[in-house]
Amino acid sequence: MKSNNNPKAMVVERYTITDRIAHTVHAIAMIVLIITGLKIYAGWEFMSFHTARTLHMIAVPFLLAVNWILIPYNIFSEGHGLMGKISHFTDHYIFGPKDAVRLGGIIKNFFRKGRYPAYSIYDEEKGHYETKLHPVMKVLIVLEGTALFLITVSGIVLYKLDWSLFGLPIAQWIISISGMIAPTFGMTPVGFLRLLHLLMTYWFIFELVVHVGILGFDPHVWKYYKAIFWSGKEDFSDPYYSEYVEKYSRFDAKKEHKQVNANKEHGHQKH
């Protein structure tokens, strides 16, 4: 990371207020759903079944609204024009070749070979992040989206076997599709959906452990928790896992050009 004489210039907005709201609501709703869901399944006695089911059903719309409305809005409100928005989405949330290189560097660092690569990179010239997520998080995002879809689909049937939307028999359609898969495992369609719902719950628990317990175990990443839950800011004077690419000014270009010419003249003098 280059030096900067103005430390304030190196403090940038990492998360908007809507980003922070989305993440906080997502976290609370997910924790409530995991606890109440396991209570309903296992029959724990710390709360009544009625209370657990009520809290579960209250948390569901919050989780879905955040993930299927607010988060997509936050993502695609960045960037200019259609291609700019697509570029922002792929650079920030899709695991690509550069992320593979960073992940390779992270693995090497684990075995004490090389420096831990920066994964939060801000370009001052462009005025936005080039990337801000850990490579592993980009993989988890895709898996979480898939798990969220599956747990929602299976949850519809567990909520009400004949649930419909605008007269469309959604639950029955889900049961019919499940009926094509369930016999392979010697299960009924509803039994298969119940197992799928439970497995996706375990997945979210695993993801929570990886996200908070492992990736967040390093004290140097705690600055990102402060940013996502409170300040929204990232201070690039802290060099851990971050890089601030400074603006390449005309003065820098002239200085570099003069240096190149001086080197050439020095070379000619030698000859």
UniProtKB/Swiss-Prot annotation:
GO terms for biological process: methanogenesis; respiratory electron transport chain. One of its GO terms (cellular component) is plasma membrane. It comes from Methanosarcina mazei (strain ATCC BAA-159 / DSM 3647 / Goe1 / Go1 / JCM 11833 / OCM 88) (Methanosarcina frisia). This is F420 non-reducing hydrogenase I cytochrome subunit. Induction: Expressed in methanol-grown cells. It catalyses: methanophenazine + H2 = dihydromethanophenazine. Gene3D superfamilies: Transmembrane di-heme cytochromes, Chain C. Keywords: Cell membrane, Electron transport, Heme, Iron, Membrane, Metal-binding, Methanogenesis, Oxidoreductase, Transmembrane, Transmembrane helix, Transport.
